[in-house]
Amino acid sequence: EDRFLSDRILHYYSKNNRKLTSKEVQKFFTDKYRLLLFMKKSDADDNKDFYYLGTCSYIDSSARQENQDGKPIVSMNLRLDNRVNYHLYHLLTD
């Protein structure tokens, strides 16, 4: 599950069946794309609201190939261009 490491750094997990070589994942590693970050409080939460957190960028050398339930998945750290608002940060992390 995605999680904040701080109010400006997010540890992100890709969708299942993604590898470091997947086109979708490769887009994170280039500055050709502007990354807009949206998040919901929890996958288990019945609330379907997404919160816009701002723009972000991939932190070099942070991507890792992992397995989840026997399926490939990629994790990486993303740095937000601006800190998440204090109240929104606590809403998403508490």
What is each PLM-predicted segment?
Residues 44-94:
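Compact mixed alphabeta submodule
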